[in-house]
Amino acid sequence: MPKKDFSITIENDSNINHLNVKAIITENEIKYKESDDTITHFNYEKNILIRENKELKMTYRFSKNNKTEGTIEVKELQKEIKVLIDTKSIKRNNYNIEIVFEIEDNHFIYRIEELV
């Protein structure tokens, strides 16, 4: 499986998190490890983002101009929290992806950019 360099940005109204990673590319997914041992999978055919670490597993499904349900699993409590995701836009050019969405009046931008 090929590895490529990517710039990842997760931005909300009060914070911008940015990191550069080496990601594994498959025919429909980008997978990378964040600095805090969070493993992230983004399925770019189905627009599903999964971020998982020891404490949480977050699964967000995006559908352009639609509202979808996402889940946040709190592993220690064995509880699952449902969240409503309002996807404003999805832009994709090869492995460069930008998703603008809202969760409970909080505005987010998730960006994956291939570094050349």
Please provide the spans of the model-predicted regions.
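Terminal leader/tail segments of proteins
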Residues: 1-116
